[in-house]
């Protein structure tokens, strides 16, 4: 099985889910109206998608840490490592804020925005690059 293809596919799904997270929160904040359902239903979906994203990111991170070879001379690889590390750190911080640090809740939208930016950066520097090479150059990266 091509683990890099699986990681790139999961990362792409994660980016789509992150876009859904943003749209759900925009509707919960009353900025747009796209999805049917009550606020409680949309909040439930936002939380469940977040749970799925956490599982996807932890699975991808595990394989990145245990299987990948880091090229310290590649700015793409280094930026991907930074995006990924910050992403997991901010996810942990958001979980702490939502569950136990209610004094920071007024900033949760900023934390969510940071998560979206970091997700986009991590996915584009990995899956985006993988699919670009595959499509444009006919090269499939393998471990």
What residue spans do the PLM features occupy?
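Membrane-embedded alpha-helical bundles that constitute the cytochrome b-like, heme-associated redox core
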Residues: 1-143
